[in-house]
Amino acid sequence: MLNRTVLVGRLTKDPELRSTPNGVNVGTFTLAVNRTFTNAQGEREADFINVVVFKKQAENVKNYLSKGSLAGVDGRLQTRNYENKDGQRVFVTEVVADSVQFLEPKNNNQQQNNNYQQQRQTQTGNNPFDNNADSIEDLPF
């Protein structure tokens, strides 16, 4: 039997980190994963999948991932249940991650925006390759 889950998607919000009474770090986050097909309106839908990660990897997720970060998760699907305050049985299905891969540098969205602004400034500044008719007489040929 095989229970293996591999996902690539973006975090819907910043990861949460807490500790068990025994001091084990537990990280949780939700990954938005696009479906491979489009709906009747031609739009691509996404699934929102809860992920749990433990120990040092939970700390790393908290420190290096944030809302919108692209991440890869390798783990297993697990269903747990508990009784809520109204006495009803609640079932929760989530991915327990064995490995979380950071698929882009931290603050990549901000960095891309800065690169775009720098590119625009360069385009509007002095361009040494601009065809300027004033300097054509200085050419040696």
Swiss-Prot record:
GO terms for cellular component: nucleoid. Residues 107-127 have a biased composition (Low complexity). The gene is ssb-p. Residues 104-141 are annotated as: Disordered. Keywords: DNA-binding. InterPro entries: NA-bd_OB-fold, Primosome_PriB/ssb, ssDNA-bd. GO terms for biological process: DNA replication. The keyword DNA-binding applies. NCBIfam families: ssb. Homotetramer. Residues 1-104 form the SSB domain. HAMAP family: SSB (MF_00984). This is Single-stranded DNA-binding protein 2. It comes from the Bacteria. GO terms for molecular function: single-stranded DNA binding. Gene3D superfamilies: Nucleic acid-binding proteins. CDD domains: SSB_OBF.
